[in-house]
C-alpha cells in the first residue's frame, strides 16, 4: 500500500508523501493523451530507479487523501505513470484506488491560464472529471459517523457552516466565542491562520 496526498501537510497527516514527489510529476498542467507539458517539452518522459519501479509493480493499493484538492489532469498523470510500469491497458495500471476526502472542503487550485488550456479536455478541474477515472466503475461510500466531536450543538453548527447555511443563530453563537486580545500559550497547540498573523502588519502599513 502507498499513501499519497496533494499537499505536504496533508501527506504528513496521512503518513505518506505528496503525489508529485512519489510519481515525480512536474507541476505544469498535464495534457491527456500526451507526455508533453505546456511548454512542449517531454517533461513526463523519464525513468524511475529500480527501487521505485519495484514499489509501483508490487503496489496493491494506492490511497489518495484529500482527493477534493486533486485536479483531473493530475489524476490522469498518475494514471499514465501506473500504466507505464504495470498494465498499460487498464486504468491506473490495474492498481486499486482508495480516494478519501470531502468535496465540500478545499477545491483544486488552477490558474486562469491553466484552465484555458485544460478546459479543452475536462468538464471541471475536479478529480472526478479525470479521463482515466471515467473508464472505471468506482463506488462511493459516504461516512456519516463523526468521531472528532461529541458536542451535538457544536457539530450542528459545523455542519451548517459546511453547507453554507450561516444564519443569524450561527453567527451569534460564533461571536459569543470571540475573545478580543486572546493570546494562546505555545504549549496549548493552537493554530494561527495566515490571515490572523498578517492582519497587524496590514494595519500598521
Annotate each language-model stretch with its function.
Residues 1-202:
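Conserved ATP-binding/catalytic motifs of P-loop helicase motor domains
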Amino acid at each position: 500500500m502507498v499513501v499519497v496526498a496533494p499537499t505536504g501537510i496533508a501527506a504528513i497527516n496521512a503518513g505518506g508523501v505528496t503525489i508529485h514527489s512519489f510519481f515525480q510529476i512536474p507541476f505544469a498542467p498535464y495534457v491527456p493523451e500526451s507526455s508533453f507539458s505546456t511548454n512542449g517539452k517531454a517533461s513526463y518522459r523519464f525513468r524511475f530507479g529500480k527501487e521505485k519501479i519495484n514499489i509501483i509493480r508490487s503496489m496493491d493499493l494506492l490511497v489518495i487523501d484529500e482527493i477534493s484538492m486533486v485536479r483531473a489532469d493530475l489524476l490522469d498523470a498518475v494514471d499514465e505513470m501506473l500504466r507505464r510500469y504495470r498494465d498499460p491497458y487498464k486504468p491506473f495500471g490495474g492498481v486499486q484506488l482508495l480516494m478519501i476526502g470531502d468535496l465540500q472542503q478545499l477545491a483544486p487550485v488552477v490558474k486562469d491560464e491553466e484552465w484555458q488550456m485544460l478546459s479543452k479536455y475536462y468538464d471541471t478541474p475536479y478529480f472526478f472529471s479525470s479521463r482515466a477515472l471515467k473508464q472505471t466503475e468506482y463506488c462511493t461510500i459516504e461516512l456519516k459517523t463523526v468521531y472528532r466531536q461529541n458536542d451535538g450543538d457544536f457539530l450542528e453548527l459545523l455542519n451548517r457552516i459546511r453547507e453554507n447555511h450561516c444564519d443569524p443563530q450561527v453567527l451569534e453563537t460564533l461571536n459569543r466565542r470571540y475573545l478580543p486580545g486572546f493570546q494562546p500559550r505555545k504549549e496549548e497547540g493552537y493554530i494561527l491562520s495566515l490571515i490572523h498573523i498578517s492582519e497587524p502588519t496590514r494595519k500598521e502599513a
